[in-house]
Amino acid sequence: LIDLLTDSGTSAMSSNQWAGIMQGDESYAGSPSFFRFEESVRSITGMPLIIPTHQGRAAEKIIFTILGGKGKYFLSNTLFDTTRANIEFSGAEGIDLICDEGKHPSIPAPFKGNMDIVALQQTITKIGAENIPMVIITITNNSGGGQPVSMQNIKAVRNICAEYQIPFFIDACRFAENAYFIKLREEGYSNKTNLEIANEIFSYADGCTMSAKKDAFANIGGFLAMRDLELAIQCRNLLIVTEGFTTYGGLAGRDLEAIAIGLQEIMDEHYLQYRIRSIEYLTNKLIEAGVPVMQPAGGHAVYIDAKEFLPHI
């Protein structure tokens, strides 16, 4: 099956997820399904404060409503479209700082999703750290062709954020593919498990947003995860107004169960190998047919260079 628009919410759920759906607890507050969801997210992110939302853009709406506003700037490798929209809706501005390799679709490089570290430093100096509420790394870089970000780049961004005391968040929609690319392409990680690599990625972040419609295979859902209790309290207060109570966040208990299970299943190396090789297979076939595409193949989709392919439009 090829979906020409998105992989968001279109994945086939596993038999375990469907079984979990049948066990979903629909209690309004304190549902056991929430606590299973919470533990699953914590096991990957290591973050203590977990806030469910009905999908990723709802998590973005909450965090940027609180931290955004006129005169504020959010820096990223490349912001996804809903992320940018929520930033701009708050009155703030989003700035993309993609690395040079990511600007050339047809030239292969192992980590074309990286942030330009020099540009990050220069932009912080120019704008002022006090005007930057957050730096965001999107993994994999969706709007940049599903390209991965290296662990070295994540650490470098983290170090700069720490120097200027700017919160560092991860847009984690496709963290599992990114972890697997690090395992395949980055020195020192070939013998580590995907979970170990994911744990390390999140250890450098102050928080994350995620749409669970991608790497959790779910048809709906998302979450915020963070370490800052004061910020989490503000997010939960807004969640109650816009999404629902803090233990369901606009989701049914059955969806929380499906997400909890999916987050564990995505870490299966055999599945990730199948997924990424499938994308690679289609990418290579298109290259053989003379179709200009983003190279190398990304983790979740084949990106056609439409400007090159259809220059007359």
Where are these regions (language model features)?
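Conserved PLP-binding catalytic core of the aspartate aminotransferase-like
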Residues: 293-313
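Conserved PLP-enzyme active-site core in the AAT-like
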Residues: 3-13, 17, 26-50, 54-291, ...
